[in-house]
C-alpha cells in the first residue's frame, strides 16, 4: 500500500471489515476448539501487523512533510485514530466477549465451573499479554524515535519504566518535539491513547481473573488505576480517562467516586460521550442499573445495621443528592409516593453529611464537584460555555435558582459544621481548604452564581466567619490580608485533580502561577513534581492556601448585599442585622491599603493593565510547550460541526426531560450514543461502524 492510500477513510473501512471477521471468530467454537483459537490468534496477529504498518507509514509520511516544511498537510488526528479504532473494533469487543464467557461460567455448577474456568483463564491471559505487549511496543517505539523532554515530564516516563529511552540516544538522533514542531500534538495524543488502553486492558484482566462473584476491591485494580492516573497527568482534558476510572469505581461499589469521575469525564475540554450519557442516566433515571445497584447496596448495609460505616455514608449522600437533582431537573417524574418535598430531601442530605462527615471529607469534596456538574447540566446543552458564564442572576430560571438555594444551604452548613471546626486540626489533609478554593473558583466562573451568592445571607455569613478564623489563625502571619494573589512554584494536589474542569473555567485561578508556567521546569511543576524548587511541607502548603482564600474571600465579600461588612478596627468581618438599614458602609479608604479595592475608574485602568500584562505573558510563553495548548488544539480538530443554539425553556434543557423519559437500561461498558450534540467524542466521530457490539457467547 502506498503512503497516499493510508488515510482516515481507508482505515475506517479496514477496521469495519476487520470487525465483521472478528465477530465470526468470537463464537462458542473458540471456547473448546484449539484449532479455532489458533486461527483467531493468526487473525489477531494480522490485524496487529496491519495496524503497525498503518502507524509506520503515517509517521513516515508526516515526518517527510515536516522536513519539507509542508506543515499544512499534516493531519493531526489520523495517527491517534488508528489506536482508537484498534481498541474499539478489535481489543475491547474481544475483552467484552471474554467477560460474557466469564459470566456464563459463573452460572455453572462448582465442579464444572473450575474446570471450564482454567480453559477460559488460559486463553484470556494469552490475549491480555498480546494486547498489553502491543501497546507497550508502540510506546517504546515512539519514545525511542522522538525526544519528548520538552513535552512530558521524566517523572511520568519513570512511572512507565521508560527512563532508558529518555537518556539513550543523543538529541540529534531523535526528532525533538516542542511547540514549533507540528508532529508534537499527534505523538503526544497517540502516547496517551496507548496508556489509556493499557489501563483498560488491566481492568478486564482484574475483573475476570478469579472464578468468583464476590465484590471487587479498588486495591485489586491498582495497576489499571495507575495507568489511568498517568494518562490523566499527560492530558487531563481527555474525558475518556475519567470514564475508564468510573468503570472501576462502579464495579467496586464506590458510588461517590463513580459519580465524581462521570462528572469529570463529561465536563472537560474534550468530553467523553459515554461519561456524559451515564451521568445523565445516573441522575435522571431511577431505574438505571447503577441506581438500582446503589439502592441494593444501601439496603444490605441497613439490614446489617452498618449505618455508621463509611460506605453507608457515601451511598446515602449520593442517593439523597441524586434525588434532589432529579427532582429539580425533571419534577414531572416525581409523584407523591416518591417524597416530592425536595426540602425534606435536602434536610436528609444535610443530616447525613453532618452526622457522618468525620473521616469522609473526600466525599464532601466529590459531592461539591457533583453539585457543580449538575448545575452545568441544567442549561440548554447547545448553549456555549461562554454564554453560560455571562448569564446574569436575573436570567436564571426558577428551577435553576431553586437548585442554587438547595446547594448553597447545604454548602453553608458544610462550612459551619465540617470545615470551620476541623481545618486547623487537619492541616495535613489538603481537602478541607481545597473545598473552599474549589467553591470560590466556581462562584467567580459564573456571573449568575456570583450575583446569587452575594444575596445569600446564610452563605455569606458562614463564609465570613470562616474568613475571620483564617485571618486570625497563627498560620497567617500577623493577621495579614493580601492585595495580590499569592505566588507558588508548582501546582497543589487539588489543582491537579481539577485541571481542565469546565465548571471552573478549566483551572483553579486563585494563585499567581506565572512562575509555574514560565519556569524551565514547567512540565514538572504542572504535575506537582518540581525539580528546580523544593516541595513544600503540608503545613507550608496550608499557609499558601490560607493566603489565597483570604484574598479571594475579601474580594468576594466586598460586594455582598447581606449585611456582612469589614470592620477595619477589629480586623474582622461584622454581621449586621438585615432589618437595620446601613446608613454608612465602611469607607473603602480604610482598607484600600490592605486589600485591592478600587474606584470604578481605577478598576477600568487596572483591568486594561492586567489584560496588557496577560497578553505579554502569553507572548513570552509562546516558545514553550504547554500541555493545555495541545488539548485546545485537539478539541478544535475534533469539533467539526457548528451547532445552532436552541431556545431554552425555563432554563432547563427540554432534552433532559426527553432523556429521562426515553433512556433504556444500558450498562456502563456499552458505548452509549449521545442525544446531546454539543459534546462530541474526544477522539473520533460517532459513526455506526465503530459501535461496540459483543458477539454471542457460549451457553
Curated annotation (Swiss-Prot):
Superkingdom per UniProt: Eukaryota
Subcellular location: Nucleus; Chromosome, Telomere
One CC-aspect GO term: nucleolus
Skewed-composition ranges (Basic and acidic residues): 647-658
Gene3D superfamilies noted in UniProt: Tetratricopeptide repeat domain
GO MF terms, alphabetically ordered: RNA binding; single-stranded DNA binding; telomerase RNA binding; telomeric DNA binding
UniProt keyword annotation of Flavoprotein present: no
Keyword NAD: no
GO biological process, one term: telomere maintenance via telomerase
Region annotation (Disordered) ranges: 641-663
Main location: nucleus
Keywords, ordered alphabetically: Chromosome, DNA-binding, Nucleus, Telomere
Subunit structure: Interacts with CDC13 and MPS3.
The protein's role, per its UniProt record: Directly involved in telomere replication. Associates with telomerase and during its interaction with CDC13, telomerase activity is promoted.
Name this polypeptide is given: Telomere elongation protein EST1
Amino acid at each position: 500500500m502506498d503512503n497516499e492510500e493510508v488515510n482516515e477513510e481507508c482505515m475506517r473501512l479496514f477496521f469495519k471489515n476487520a470487525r465483521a471477521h472478528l465477530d465470526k471468530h468470537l463464537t462458542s467454537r473458540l471456547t473448546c476448539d484449539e484449532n479455532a483459537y489458533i486461527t483467531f490468534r493468526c487473525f489477531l496477529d494480522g490485524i496487529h501487523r496491519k495496524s503497525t504498518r498503518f502507524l509506520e507509514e503515517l509517521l513516515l509520511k508526516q515526518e517527510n512533510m515536516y522536513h519539507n516544511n509542508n506543515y499544512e498537510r499534516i493531519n493531526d488526528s489520523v495517527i491517534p485514530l488508528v489506536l482508537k479504532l484498534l481498541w474499539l473494533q478489535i481489543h475491547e469487543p474481544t475483552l467484552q466477549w471474554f467477560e460474557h464467557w466469564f459470566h456464563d461460567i459463573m452460572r455453572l455448577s462448582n465442579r464444572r465451573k473450575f474446570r471450564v474456568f482454567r480453559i477460559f483463564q488460559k486463553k484470556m491471559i494469552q490475549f491480555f499479554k498480546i494486547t498489553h505487549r502491543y501497546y507497550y511496543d508502540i510506546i517504546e517505539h515512539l519514545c525511542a524515535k522522538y525526544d519528548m523532554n520538552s513535552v512530558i515530564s521524566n517523572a511520568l516516563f519513570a512511572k512507565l519504566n521508560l527512563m532508558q529511552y529518555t537518556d539513550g540516544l543523543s538529541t540529534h538522533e531523535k526528532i525533538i518535539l516542542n511547540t514549533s514542531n507540528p508532529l508534537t500534538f499527534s505523538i503526544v495524543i497517540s502516547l496517551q491513547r496507548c496508556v489509556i488502553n493499557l489501563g483498560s486492558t488491566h481492568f478486564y484482566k482484574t475483573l475476570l481473573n478469579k472464578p468468583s462473584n464476590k465484590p471487587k476491591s479498588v486495591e485489586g485494580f491498582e495497576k489499571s488505576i495507575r495507568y489511568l492516573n498517568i494518562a490523566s497527568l499527560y492530558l487531563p482534558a481527555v474525558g475518556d480517562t475519567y470514564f475508564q476510572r468510573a468503570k472501576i469505581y462502579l464495579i467496586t461499589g464506590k458510588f461517590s467516586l463513580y459519580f465524581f469521575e462521570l462528572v469529570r469525564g463529561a465536563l472537560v475540554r474534550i468530553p467523553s460521550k459515554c461519561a456524559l450519557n451515564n451521568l445523565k442516566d445516573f441522575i435522571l433515571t431511577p431505574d438505571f442499573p447503577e441506581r438500582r445497584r446503589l439502592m441494593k447496596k444501601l439496603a444490605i448495609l441497613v439490614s446489617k445495621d452498618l449505618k455508621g460505616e463509611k460506605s453507608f455514608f457515601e451511598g446515602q449522600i449520593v442517593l439523597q443528592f441524586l434525588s434532589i437533582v432529579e427532582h429539580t431537573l425533571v419534577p414531572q417524574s416525581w409523584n407523591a409516593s416518591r417524597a416530592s418535598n425536595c426540602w425534606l430531601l435536602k434536610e436528609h442530605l444535610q443530616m447525613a453529611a453532618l452526622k457522618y462527615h468525620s473521616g469522609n471529607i473526600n466525599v464532601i469534596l466529590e459531592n461539591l464537584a457533583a453539585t457543580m456538574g449538575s448545575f452545568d447540566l441544567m442549561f440548554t446543552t447547545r448553549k456555549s460555555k461562554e454564554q453560560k458564564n455571562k448569564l446574569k442572576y436575573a436570567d436564571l430560571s426558577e428551577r435553576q435558582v431553586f437548585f442554587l438555594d438547595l446547594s448553597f444551604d447545604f454548602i453553608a452548613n458544610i462550612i459551619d459544621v465540617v470545615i470551620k471546626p476541623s481545618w486547623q486540626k487537619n492541616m495535613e489533609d489538603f481537602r478541607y481548604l481545597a473545598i473552599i478554593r474549589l467553591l470560590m473558583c466556581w462562584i467567580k466562573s459564573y456571573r449568575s452564581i456570583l450575583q446569587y451568592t452575594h444575596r445569600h445571607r446564610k452563605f455569606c455569613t458562614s463564609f465570613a466567619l470562616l474568613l475571620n478564623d483564617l485571618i486570625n489563625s497563627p498560620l497567617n502571619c500577623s493577621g495579614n490580608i493580601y492585595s495580590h494573589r499569592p505566588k507558588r512554584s508548582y501546582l497543589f494536589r487539588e489543582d491537579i485533580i481539577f485541571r481542565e474542569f469546565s465548571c471552573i473555567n478549566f483551572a483553579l485561578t486563585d494563585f499567581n502561577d506565572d512562575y509555574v508556567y514560565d519556569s524551565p521546569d514547567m512540565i514538572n511543576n504542572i504535575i506537582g513534581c518540581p525539580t528546580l524548587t523544593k516541595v513544600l511541607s503540608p503545613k507550608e502548603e496550608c499557609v499558601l492556601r490560607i493566603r489565597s482564600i483570604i484574598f479571594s474571600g475579601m474580594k468576594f465579600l466586598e460586594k455582598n448585599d447581606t449585611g456582612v461588612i469589614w470592620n477595619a478596627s477589629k480586623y474582622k468581618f461584622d454581621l449586621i442585622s438585615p432589618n437595620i438599614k446601613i446608613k454608612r458602609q465602611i469607607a473603602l479608604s480604610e482598607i484600600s491599603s490592605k486589600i485591592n479595592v478600587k474606584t470604578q475608574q481605577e478598576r477600568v485602568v487596572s483591568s486594561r493593565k492586567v489584560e496588557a500584562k496577560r497578553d505579554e505573558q502569553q507572548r513570552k510563553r509562546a516558545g514553550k510547550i504547554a500541555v493545555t495548548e495541545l488539548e485546545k488544539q485537539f478539541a478544535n480538530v475534533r469539533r467539526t460541526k457548528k451547532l445552532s443554539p436552541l431556545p431554552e425553556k425555563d432554563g432547563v434543557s427540554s432534552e433532559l426531560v426527553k432523556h429521562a423519559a426515553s433512556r433504556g437500561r444500558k450498562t456502563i461498558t456499552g458505548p452509549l450514543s449521545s442525544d446531546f450534540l454539543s459534546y462530541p467524542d474526544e477522539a473520533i466521530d460517532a459513526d455506526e461502524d465503530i459501535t461496540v457490539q459483543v458477539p454471542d457467547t457460549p451457553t
